[in-house]
């Protein structure tokens, strides 16, 4: 299985990749996986992280405003995009997380520069890799909709569950 991060890493290592070659590098053979790759490529193009040139080759945009970081959230609801030891952390407001969870590898765009001793503020544009594939949660009904509420209070988003599937334990 590929991630947005593996797509970007493969494109950064080359001058341009054709779709078939990218599929080979990512070891994609199934039609369903190719459909998922198409969706990911369109999303990355829309975010202006990659582009497709006139030769139908995909390239990584060098001067992109996006930074790769890891999300760290506190139980009090404060979230930061951590970039590394020597780089300043970026504050992410709860409504700008775009369903990123604590520990996820993400692409962040700075929307407000830091001043004095305040951190810059940013928005999560793309989740590159999920840190947790499994989420332990409790199921609650809110306004006739069914939600999974994460037990880990560092995960700030609730997940709406389909009503058709009545296998939820209450």
Indicate where each model-derived feature is located:
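Charge-lined substrate channels and their catalytic hotspots, especially those that engage the 3′ end
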Residues: 1-170
């Amino acid at each position: 299985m590929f991630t947005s991060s593996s797509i970007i890493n493969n494109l950064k290592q080359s001058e341009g990749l054709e779709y078939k070659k990218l599929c080979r590098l990512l070891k994609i053979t199934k039609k369903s996986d190719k459909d998922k790759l198409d969706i990911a490529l369109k999303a990355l193009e829309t975010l202006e992280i990659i582009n497709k040139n006139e030769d139908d080759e995909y390239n990584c945009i060098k001067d992109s405003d996006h930074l790769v970081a890891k999300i760290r959230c506190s139980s009090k609801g404060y979230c930061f995009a951590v970039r590394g030891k020597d780089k300043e952390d970026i504050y992410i407001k709860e409504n700008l997380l775009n369903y990123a969870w604590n520990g996820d590898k993400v692409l962040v765009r700075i929307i407000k520069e830091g001043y004095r001793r305040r951190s810059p503020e940013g928005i999560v544009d793309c989740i590159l890799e999920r840190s947790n594939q499994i989420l332990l949660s409790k199921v609650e009904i809110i306004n006739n909709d069914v939600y999974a509420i994460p037990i880990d209070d560092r995960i700030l988003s609730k997940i709406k569950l389909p009503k058709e599937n009545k296998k939820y334990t209450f």
